[in-house]
Amino acid sequence: MKTAHEVRPGNVIMLDGNPWVVLKTETSRSGRNAAVVKLKLKNVLLDSTTETSFKGEDKLDVIVLDRLDCTYSYFADPMYVFMDEEFNQYDVEAENLGDAAAYITDGMEDVCQVTFYEEKAISVELPIIVTREVTYTEPSARGDTSGKVMKPATIAGGSTLSVADFVKTGDMIEIDTRTNEFKKRV
C-alpha cells in the first residue's frame, strides 16, 4: 500500500478489482484543505482511460508486477518497441507511456523498466534523471539577471520545459522525468 502522494507514473494500482496503469499524476494544495492528487489512469484489461482524484494520504493498492530492464529500440506506430539483454522485443502502446513518450528518442541509451501484467508489456518507467540535447531556445536576455531567470526550451523528442537563462541551443541538460524540470547543464 502506498499513499496517493507516493504513486508515480508507470505504477499499477488495483481499483474495483481491475489493474490500472498510472499515466499522469498532479498534486494540488490549497491553504486550508489537504492536498489532492489527480491521477490519469488506463485500465490494463479494457484499454479505457479515466481521471480520478484522491486525498494525498489515501492508501492505494499498488501491485508489484514483473519488471524487466530494457532499452528503446524503435517506434512502429502505435507501438514503442523495447529490447532486453537477450534481444527479446516487447511492444508497448504509445498511449500507455503517457508523458514518458516525450523523453524517448532514437539512439537513447537510458535503461528503462518495462512492466508486465499477465505476460503483456503494459508500461515503461524511465530513469528519474535523463540527459537530453536542447534543440531550440531563445538567446539569453541581456541585463535580466535578478533572481532565478528561466526561459522555454525544446529538447530532443519535442518536449518543452523551462531552463536556466544561460542554457543555449545544442547544450546537454539533465531533466527530472517525474516533474519535467530542468536540473542542470551537463
Curated annotation (Swiss-Prot):
GO MF terms on file?
translation elongation factor activity
User: One GO BP annotation here?
Assistant: peptide biosynthetic process
For this protein, the record's Pfam families field holds:
EFP (PF01132), EFP_N (PF08207), Elong-fact-P_C (PF09285)
Look up the record and name the pathway of this protein.
Answer: Protein biosynthesis; polypeptide chain elongation
What is one cellular component GO term in this UniProt entry?
A: cytoplasm
Kindly report the protein's main subcellular placement as a broad class: cytoplasm
SUPFAM superfamilies from the UniProt entry: Nucleic acid-binding proteins, Translation proteins SH3-like domain
| UniProt cross-references to InterPro entries, sorted A to Z | Elong-fact-P_C (IPR015365), NA-bd_OB-fold (IPR012340), Rib_uL2_dom2 (IPR014722), Transl_elong_fac_P/YeiP (IPR020599), Transl_elong_KOW-like (IPR013185), Transl_elong_P/YeiP_cen (IPR001059), Transl_elongation_fac_P (IPR011768), Translation_prot_SH3-like_sf (IPR008991)
Q: Which UniProt keywords apply?
A: Cytoplasm, Elongation factor, Protein biosynthesis
Q: Where in the cell is it found?
A: Cytoplasm
Which positions make up the signal peptide?
Answer: none
**In terms of domain of life, where is this protein from?**
Bacteria
Stated role: Involved in peptide bond synthesis. Stimulates efficient translation and peptide-bond synthesis on native or reconstituted 70S ribosomes in vitro. Probably functions indirectly by altering the affinity of the ribosome for aminoacyl-tRNA, thus increasing their reactivity as acceptors for peptidyl transferase.
Family stated for the protein in its record? Belongs to the elongation factor P family.
Recorded protein name is Elongation factor P
What gene does this protein come from? efp
